Amino acid sequence: MKSSTLETQSKEINLHDDISSYAVPFDHHIIQKYGKKSFVWIGPIPRLNIMDPDMIRDILINYNTFHKPKGNFLLKLLVDGLAFEEGERWAKLRKILNPAFNLHKLKNMLPAIYLSCSEIVSKWETLISPTGSSEINVLPYLAYLSADVISRTAFGSSYEEGRRIFQLQKEQIQLILENSQSSYIPGWRFLPTKSNKKMKEINREIRAIVKDLISKREKKLKEGEMKTEDLLGMLLESNIKEIQESGNKKDAGITIDQVIEECKLFYFAGQETTSNLLAWTMVMLATHRNWQERAREEVFQVFGNNKPDFEGLNHLKVVTMILNEVLRLYPPVSMVSRKTYETTKLGDVTLPPGVEHLLHITFVHHDTELWGDDAKEFNPERFSQGVAKAVQKPNSYFPFGLGPRICIGQNLATIEAKMAVAMILQRFLFELSPSYLHGPQIRLTLQPRFGAHMILHKI
């Protein structure tokens, strides 16, 4: 599996090529050869490929039957918490987290998002030559932008500590990718290898930083000294409220360890998802200049040269269509998995316990039977009447998942993306650099393997 991926991704592909065979070559080969309802053995585990939207809906709606597989211990060094909890533990955690992600709370985060976006576009302006244009690999800047947004919105005034967490998480991702194959060797995690020691050391440092932030914030909240609008403050407030409403029962609320894991999840999911969405959006708009012009015209019509506001962002129809289409073509994750632990009926198939179900987001999003002959082409017009009318068969579009376990941070990611796109369009025209190489690669999330090199022109 790994060798086929490395061989396929050793060079770039054409911008108009099907990315599925490049990004996930092994699964693409299996589905092409054996069909959309095929299965393979991954060691002792039978893995069923799922591409039928009705089955996908049934699996994601019935979360008490179709469970998330127990996370690989390497992945759990990076993220845990809500992403992997099940049953009552998940329901309690989601209830405590929900208030922090409602639209009213997100609206109050807009100034922090604006500051992060402003810093990056100002930096780009200083990099552009006096002639009015320069080549820039925008990918690292967009990664910094998204990390900065999460630092500010998650930790508020403590965002410098948040930046340190981002640096550590970035290092951890690289180590996890380098050691992903070794993790299948029984007992490997207990060996005192250099990488194992380093990963555990990074995890300890991240936890120590977050624990210190939490302790300081809890102390101030209990003393009534501050009421914050960042995610950590709202999470702690919601947790205190949950404990008080339960009559201070011992098992009410969530533990400090759970709060730490949620903060780590904020970082990984928030930063990776949005930075890659912005990078692919710039690549698509640089390639399809007519859509770039339509989006810019809309942005100037709504905001002029003024600072984007919450109400205006909600009126950006063309920008929303573009982001939806980018998420269709380049979803943040290419697949989600579920597992059954008892005999289960799915459609007309009865499955034994222990089957893993792979729900292929990229393949479904690119399926010509669902989306038409232009399924692999960039055409935001398909979303002109909203997501529901973009495709004939429901549940064929799920970049953030479906059902009760849909991504809790999707609204934050969307608001951040709209703000960044609007501010970039206000200040720059951009096109692909001749040095741009197209290589959609999965490194936990789908990202441009060779960067995103653009020629930026000041407006």
Residue ranges and their predicted role:
Residues 264, 269, 335, 383-417, ...:
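Cytochrome P450 heme-thiolate "Cys pocket" and heme-binding signature region
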Residues 1-88, 92, 114-123, 160, ...:
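N-terminal membrane-proximal hinge/A-helix region immediately C-terminal to the signal-anchor transmembrane segment
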Residues 67-74, 85, 89, 108-276, ...:
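Cytochrome P450 heme-thiolate monooxygenase catalytic core
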Residues 274-286, 420:
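Short, small-residue alpha-helix embedded
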Residues 12-35, 208, 212, 306-347, ...:
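Conserved cytochrome P450 K-helix E-x-x-R motif and the immediately C-terminal K′/meander segment
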Residues 359-388:
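Conserved cytochrome P450 K-helix/beta-meander segment immediately N-terminal to the heme-binding cysteine loop
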Residues 237, 429, 445-459:
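C-terminal helix/juxtamembrane-tail motif
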